[in-house]
Amino acid sequence: MKLHEYQARDIVARYGIPVTGGGVAATAEEVQKVAEQIGGPVAVKAQVHVGGRGKAGGIKLANTPAEAFDAGKAILGMDIKGLTVEKVLVAEAITFEKEIYLGVILDRATKRVVLIASSEGGVEIEEVAKINPDAIIKLAADPLLGLQPYQAQELAYSIGITDAKQARQFSSIATGLYRAFVENDAELAEINPLVVLPNGQLQALDSKIVLDDSGLFRHSEVAGMRDIAGEPESEIKARENGLTFIKLDGNIGCMVNGAGLAMATMDVVNLFGGEPANFLDIGGGANAQKVAAALDIILDDPNVKVVMVNIFGGITRCDEVAKGIVEAQKIIKRQVPMVVRLVGTNEAEGQRILADASLTPASTLADAAQKAVDIAKQ
């Protein structure tokens, strides 16, 4: 679950991390009121779950409350990559001398919580990794002891912070961000940028937190922050139907049971020169209704030219999947070619149900991927 910037800002502030003054607003009048309370230049920032809001005109500076009103009026209601701006963060605009990146992630390769820091903040960390990977420093925290203050100070020195007082403050901020990550079951927590003020103090200018949906039952207060209106409709539909769905940029829709098989399917599609349009795991024991819902979600994407179904039936019954496919074809208006591989429990019955449907059968994963890629290229 993604949090808006203003929500992430409130969470990191609870952990002793200094943030800029400001507040959230849903109308231009509220924007002006917050700007008056700040009493100086402000930044009016669109709160949407997509990147590139600055380039889209979703961030504006204002020197007076009247200018803030105009900025709020311009941004609220704006469409940014398909999402409507319903709230803005009105934050104090400050002068700073340097930008730093600080983030916390779960590194599955090392099975550790890892802190990432860079002296090149203010830009996407992925861009820094491409252009100057040596500017990125990583530190793995011990899962039993947690992040130790001396480790955080070493991280500060590693990114060029030489002032002892500043290094101690960085250590405090890094420890706070680490705690925010662990205690809220997050997948990502980052401050970008963490800025150095003219007086040498550090302050978080922008915060981002992504929570693990599987841990939300332990955090009812945070779970209530979910902004359904700010999420893609496809992800909302998937969650309501118990599906795991991630939209990608390709044109080959994928419906698979099991996360591992879904990733393997996407890899094989890439191997044969295709581009998956999504990751979609229908899970174990999926019934016809869930399969139909999955196909409906996939076909909501206008880029999809073909759907590849790859089912290895264990708990999931192939005949139930087949029934769902046939049912979906009856009710879904948009029809595209489908390549179907069914192997496992009730396989023969599933093949019988699909015999009269306008589908392309496949016997192996490689066969299915090749056929799907060939159709997508037509």
From Swiss-Prot:
The biological processes this protein is annotated with in GO are: succinyl-CoA metabolic process; tricarboxylic acid cycle
What is the enzyme's class at the highest EC level?
ligase
Alphabetically ordered keywords of this record = ATP-binding, Ligase, Magnesium, Metal-binding, Nucleotide-binding, Tricarboxylic acid cycle
Q: Which InterPro entries match?
A: ATP-grasp, ATP-grasp_succ-CoA_synth-type, ATP_grasp_subdomain_1, Succ-CoA_synthase_bsu_CS, SUCC_ACL_C, Succ_CoA_ligase-like_bsu, Succinyl-CoA_synth-like
This entry's comment on the bound cofactor is:
Binds 1 Mg(2+) ion per subunit.
What EC number(s) would the UniProt record show? 6.2.1.5
Q: Which residues bind ATP?
A: 45, 52-54, 94, 99
Name any one GO molecular function.
ATP binding
* Pathway this chain belongs to: Carbohydrate metabolism; tricarboxylic acid cycle; succinate from succinyl-CoA (ligase route): step 1/1
> Which cofactors are reported in the record for this sequence?
Mg(2+)
The chain positions of domain ATP-grasp read: 9-237
Q: Which Gene3D superfamilies match?
A: ATP-grasp fold, A domain (3.30.1490.20), ATP-grasp fold, B domain (3.30.470.20), Succinyl-CoA synthetase domains (3.40.50.261)
Q: Which residues does the record give as substrate binding sites?
A: 257, 314-316
Q: Which reaction does it catalyse?
A: succinate + ATP + CoA = succinyl-CoA + ADP + phosphate; GTP + succinate + CoA = succinyl-CoA + GDP + phosphate
* One cellular-component annotation, GO: cytosol
| SUPFAM superfamilies noted in UniProt | Glutathione synthetase ATP-binding domain-like (SSF56059), Succinyl-CoA synthetase domains (SSF52210)
Q: Pfam families from the entry?
A: ATP-grasp_2, Ligase_CoA
Q: Where does Mg(2+) bind?
A: 192, 206
The record's comment on protein family reads: Belongs to the succinate/malate CoA ligase beta subunit family.
Q: What does this protein do?
A: Succinyl-CoA synthetase functions in the citric acid cycle (TCA), coupling the hydrolysis of succinyl-CoA to the synthesis of either ATP or GTP and thus represents the only step of substrate-level phosphorylation in the TCA. The beta subunit provides nucleotide specificity of the enzyme and binds the substrate succinate, while the binding sites for coenzyme A and phosphate are found in the alpha subunit.
Assembly and interaction partners: Heterotetramer of two alpha and two beta subunits.
| Protein name as catalogued | Succinate--CoA ligase [ADP-forming] subunit beta
What is the scientific name of the source organism?
A: Herpetosiphon aurantiacus (strain ATCC 23779 / DSM 785 / 114-95)
